[in-house]
Amino acid sequence: KAVFESWKLQGGTKETFLSNLQKNQEVKNIILSESPWVLEAQTEEQQKERIATLFDLNNIRSNNIAALTRLQELQNSNGAWSWYKGMNGSRSVTTYIAELNARLAMLTGEKLSGSALSLQQKAFAYLHQSALDEYKEILKAQKDGVKFTGVSGSILQYLYLIAISGEQVPAANKAAYTYYLSKVGELLTSPSMDTKAIAAIVLDKAGRKKEAQEFVASLKEHLTKTDEQGMFFAFNENPYTWGGMQMQAHVDVMEVLEQTGGNTDTVEEMKLWLLKQKQTQQWNSPVATADA
């Protein structure tokens, strides 16, 4: 914040917001002027101007009200949000929005209130019903001899959301919740780092500490370390699947390592990788930025 205040004291002119790369004529003249680094620099002044507005409290309040109002307009009557207004509700979109609200409350230590709380309660009503409907389908399939291992991605996110928010499971969902929780341990063999991280958080919050540590140990085995980049997962990103997004997996693993304790050095090394991504190429989407 002090940096941006100093820019304001300089008059806040276009020149004070110019990126360091743009100011450096020698760098601009080299052959690398065709590289993405300079393309980044051409927009950095706009980024700085926008970042400066983050410290305007009146602007923050106004944006919060506008965002909540927009979320209210987009939420369906059953509590779900959809990809676009007018479409059927989406479990993944609803879960993601509810997760962000829960994570904000967890990070700030402030409980949701007012319209934010109302939005969250309606979203949970939809997600509880969706989880119950899926449980009924599972019971029906089991009668036909179908066997299930682990839980679906939607259910794992549902369990995670309950774990981090402290949401009380409705009486009608108790049996479904107990069943789902009993199957989480079977995800240890999953190839997805994101799945393992979320499963570990769910297990740890449920008091199944030993099982959670087994997941943590498995996650650590897949971490790569370099002096420059810190610690990270060296795998090819698949932006078309939620669990295949590298940033999502990275921060979820950081979360479980912090939650289970005794991993301070590893978490610090993982923070280094996170910052390096921003330094060299920007976080590549709004989702990745929110996670980071």
Regions found by a protein language model. Give the residues of each.
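Large, well-folded core regions of big proteins
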Residues: 1-291
